[in-house]
A protein has these predicted regions:
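Ser/Thr-rich, Proline-interspersed low-complexity disordered segments
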Residues: 12-15, 20-59
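N-terminal lobe/hinge region of extracytoplasmic solute-binding protein
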Residues: 73, 78-160
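Gly/Pro-rich hinge or "lid" segments in bacterial periplasmic/extracellular proteins
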Residues: 119-144, 249-345, 466-475, 664-668
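Aromatic- and charge-enriched surface segment that lines or borders ligand/interaction sites
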Residues: 155-200, 230, 362-365, 423-425, ...
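Ligand-site clamp/hinge motif
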Residues: 170, 303-307, 334-385, 517, ...
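Extracellular/periplasmic solute-recognition and catalytic clefts
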Residues: 193, 197-206, 221-222, 317-328, ...
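Surface-exposed binding/hinge segments that line
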Residues: 206-295, 644, 651-652
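Detector for C-terminal structural segments
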Residues: 310, 316, 320-327, 331, ...
Length: 669
């Protein structure tokens, strides 16, 4: 086994030196947003790059894909100039990905019939494709928050101490069905969706309230004209723009939705009598709001079968397929981006994602050369197999950075068991489990050395492997008695175990869980590992039925949606209390409220300024003092699979950032 690990390590080292430019250092966590300049101008600031006044012809003279040119010639589509906005988003070096991540960006060429093949393991959900399709309202390179520019929205202006935000839309921007995108789509979203108690009982989302707080003061929308609108807050909301970039994987649908379609299913515009037939088809009577929810496709829904034909502004649009297991996405003829030569993006015609049984089956498709791009289901544990099959499969394994902490133990501290709550809510118990983890063994055997100790999220002291200290802490908690198998009894004298259910969301989670179960025996903790279907895992988590799990975690500094994502796993009922403004769930203890208050203060301040950064450091200190979840490793490398023919594939930075720049991928020879 040691020999195999040594050989595998050599393979991974060779990968780093060859595919990653001689071992470039890992990209840092996205830097905080630069302070927003107090705007003085009365006109909209210009986009970072202007579209050519007259687009320069590409090398082959084509400014649109052959499949679209054929439709124009047949009279099935308007000419390209009529499909693009007056000022398209211009893509070139450093726009979607920084030049540090992609130093050799090149303008691509169309290939008629080009397809990106990928695979997914969850029914009606293709995560790699979702990320490729998701378009935020605003954008910054590398999924960061520095250098925020327009995206779906053309531009913005910030005034009055970060209280007034004016947004400028792209005149001539169209939905994928050819209808114009205007401020009516914004007004409808704000007033008729968020302002309707049936559709949104809690009203405006937290992201549109001061401090990103469900109880914060709401913003006020003002429509200026067909392409200009303003959102005003009663107090500073310095980091509001971050919520329009990519926080929480949100997309433009948080703010802009196709009113011309959705009004058909809304009783403010369509009498309920006209909805009766469709209500009956869906086994509904008067519940028009439920029907509306089924017709409304938000950014998370774009790969779901019910969204076939739904208008979007994404680069590819879901098409009908002969099999529900095969998802086909075809280029959007009205997509709003062009490259520096004037060619409409995306370069590639289609994405096809095939559903298979599980993550292992997804990886099997990689090895047999049936995948052109994959990130979501890869793992370092698979790298030796990837490297062995690269030539045969026609792909490269690109070692990039993971945007999350890849493996974290979440103890659901609100799981409905009094003894469990007593123990899991005591920081000594969480520290004991952390000390029992032999991280060196995990880093060597699972990550081949390409991971580090969780210095930010757990800290040096509590991530040290110290079985003696772990046992002492458990003794302090009254867990001094053991059963015949050497497992500790609970402080009540009854058998004690931790059921760790996981959905095998990534290849490394199951082997890590099994290794942890062995390591926990050294401190007398019965760590029971159970793999369940990933959809069932989500349902059990939502219902507060998971006692514990192993999953990835976002930035551990108590910040924005990342805190909420983690809170939903280490304190499900606390999370419900927060997101419902105290109407449901369980009120969290003071140490959790402290993080929520700091989170609100950070959102009110401007990212990158002194106050914001100081609060971030306080967040790390809070994390290390309380260890709300037990992060196993940080700074993990992430293998991404890309066809040897794909171009504009990054060599550094976050792997997932390549998904978000999928429209600039193209096939070379």
């Amino acid at each position: 086994m040691k020999k195999f690990r040594f050989l595998s390590l050599l393979v991974v080292l060779a990968l780093v030196l060859s595919a990653c430019g001689g071992g470039a250092p890992a990209a840092e966590q996205p830097a905080a947003e630069a302070p927003a300049a107090e705007a003085q101008a009365t006109e909209a600031p210009k986009e970072e790059a202007a579209a050519p006044a007259e687009a320069a012809p590409a090398a082959d003279g084509a400014l649109e894909a052959p499949m679209l040119a054929a439709k124009v010639a047949a009279g099935e589509l308007p000419a390209l100039a009529e499909r693009l906005p007056a000022e398209p988003k211009v893509i070139g070096p450093g726009v979607l990905l920084s030049e540090e991540s992609l130093p050799d960006w090149t303008a691509g060429q169309y290939q008629d019939g080009s397809v990106i093949r990928t695979a997914h393991s969850v029914a009606d959900w293709a995560p790699d494709v979702f990320v490729m399709l998701n378009e935020p309202a605003l954008h910054a390179p590398d999924l960061g928050v520095q250098g925020i520019k327009g995206n779906v929205l053309k531009d913005f202006l910030v005034e009055e101490d970060n209280k007034v935000f004016t947004f400028y839309m792209r005149e001539g921007l169209k939905w994928s069905d050819g209808e114009p995108v205007t401020t009516e789509d914004v007004r409808f979203t704000w007033e008729n969706i968020y302002g309707n108690e049936k559709l949104t009982p809690a009203g405006l989302k937290a992201r549109f309230r001061v401090g990103n707080d469900p109880k914060g003061e709401p913003g006020v929308l003002e429509i200026i004209d067909d392409y200009t609108f303003k959102i005003t807050y009663p107090s500073p909301y310095g980091s509001f723009l971050r919520n329009l970039v990519i926080e929480g994987w949100n997309g433009y649908t948080e703010l802009i939705n196709p009113a011309h379609v959705l009004k058909k299913w809304h009783t403010d515009f369509t009498p309920i009598e006209e909805l009766k037939e469709e209500l009956t088809k869906n086994n509904l009577t008067e519940e028009w709001w439920t029907l509306f929810g089924q017709k409304w496709c938000q950014n998370w829904d774009v790969t779901r079968e019910r969204c076939i034909g739904y208008p979007t502004v994404n680069p590819w649009v879901l098409q009908a397929s002969d099999s529900p297991a095969t998802k086909i996405f075809e280029r959007n003829p009205y997509y709003f981006k062009v490259d520096v030569e004037g060619k409409q993006l995306p370069y590639i015609d289609k994405i096809v994602s095939q559903q298979v049984e599980d993550v292992e089956a997804v990886n099997l498709k990689v090895l047999t050369g049936e995948v052109d791009f994959l990130r979501e289901s890869t793992g370092l544990v698979k790298v030796p197999l990837y490297k062995e099959n690269e030539e045969k499969g026609g792909f490269n394994t690109v070692l990039l950075d993971m945007h999350v902490d890849s493996s974290t133990i979440f103890l659901n501290q609100t799981f409905d068991n009094p003894v469990w709550q007593q123990l899991s809510q005591d920081v000594r118990f969480r520290k004991a489990l952390s000390h029992a983890i032999n991280r060196d063994e995990i880093i060597e055997s699972i990550y081949y050395g390409f991971a580090g100790y969780p210095m930010k999220s757990v800290g040096e002291e509590n991530s040290t492997y110290d079985v003696e200290q772990a046992n002492a802490l458990l003794d302090e908690l009254g867990m001094t008695e053991k059963d015949a198998d050497g497992f500790r009894l609970g402080p009540d004298g009854e058998p004690f175990s931790i059921l760790v259910e996981h959905g095998a969301h990534a290849p490394d989670l199951e082997p890590i869980a099994e290794l942890l179960a062995e390591q926990m025996k050294d401190i007398g903790i019965n760590f029971q590992i159970k793999r369940i279907d990933s959809q069932l895992w989500g349902q059990r988590n939502d219902a507060n039925e998971l006692q514990a799990t192993i999953f990835w975690a976002h930035d551990q500094n108590g910040d924005n949606d990342r805190l909420m994502g983690n809170l939903g796993l280490f304190g499900r009922q606390w999370n419900t209390w927060f997101t419902t403004g105290g109407a449901e769930g369980v009120e969290p203890p003071a140490w959790v409220k402290e993080a929520l208050d700091r989170n609100k203060a950070r959102w009110e301040s401007v990212a990158g300024e002194e106050q914001y950064n100081a609060l971030a450091e306080e967040g790390y200190a809070w994390q290390q003092a309380n260890i709300p979840q037990i992060t196993i490793v940080e700074d993990v490398k992430y293998p991404m699979i890309a066809s040897k023919r794909l171009r504009n594939v990054p060599s550094a930075g976050y792997a997932i950032a390549c998904n978000f720049a999928g429209e600039q991928l193209w096939y070379g020879e």
